[in-house]
Amino acid sequence: MDKQNKKIPQLCGKDLCTACHACYNICSKKAIIMVEDQYGELHPQIDDNLCVKCGMCEKVCPELKQNNLHRNGEPKIYACWLKNSEHRKESTSGGAAFAISSAVIRQRGHVWGAAYGKDMYLTYIEANTLEELKAIQKSKYTQCHVEEAFKTIKNELDSGDLVLFTGTGCHVKGLRSFLRKDYPNLMTADLVCHGVPGQGVFRKYKEHLEAKFNDEMLTYIPRPKRNVDGQEGQYYSLAYFKNKGNIKMEKNNN
C-alpha cells in the first residue's frame, strides 16, 4: 500500500491513554502534540498535515501493542529501608529509591525522576549528583509530564551510560515500549500507584491556596514526616509559601 492510501494512525482513546508519551517521543516528524483536557490531563493529538502515516506511534503504544520486553516471571519481593536516618527523613517512605539512585550516581550514571519546576510544573528531570537528586525525593501526587525525556534517555543508553528511570508504572511501561528493546544498562523503579490527577487539578488547588493566604506557593509536600520514621495517623500536607513559610494543610484550612 503506497503512502497516499495509508490511513492516519489511530491512537488509543482517553479511557486507555496514560499519557506515557511513547507516541510523542517516537514521532520523528513532530506530528503529535500533547493536549490538556478540561481536567488538566494530557492526551496525544495527531496533526494530519505533518503525519507521514508511518504507524510508529501505534507500534510503541503500550495500550495498543503488547510486547514481551523485560519479562522476568514472578518478581522477588523484599522489604527494606535506608539506614541513613537523615536521608530517610527526607524521603516519603523508607528511602529505598534514594539509596538505589545514589548507587547509580556513584557509578557516574544518570537518574531520572519527577521534580517540580517553575510554577510547580511537574516534569521528569535528570540528576547526576546527590545534590540534584534532592529535587526528585518525596511523592508528588499529580501526573508528571514526560515531554522529550525518553529521547534523551535513549541517547544515553545507546552511548553505554547507566540509566535509572523512576516513575509511575505506566511511564516505565511507556519508556520500555518506546525503546523497543531491552537495554542491560537500563534500570527502572516504579511504585504502587492508584491513579493520579492531571496537573490542571493541582494548578487550581495551588491558585486557591495562594488566594486564601495571599502569598506565592513555592513547594508542596503531600505526606510530610513529623520525625525520621513518620507517624501513624498523620493526615495533613505541607505547603511552603514565599513570605509565610510552611503552613500545614489540614481539614480546617484547606
How would you name each of these model-derived features?
Residues N49-L50:
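Short, charged amphipathic alpha-helical surface segments
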Residues A22-Y39, H43-Q45, M56-G73:
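Iron-sulfur cluster-binding cysteine motifs and their immediate structural context
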Residues D2-Q4, D37, Y78-W81:
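A short alpha-helix capping/helix-coil boundary motif
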Residues K7-Q10, L42-H43, N84-E86:
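A short, structure-level motif marking secondary-structure boundaries and short turns
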Residues K65-N254:
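Iron-sulfur-associated redox domains of electron-transfer enzymes in respiratory
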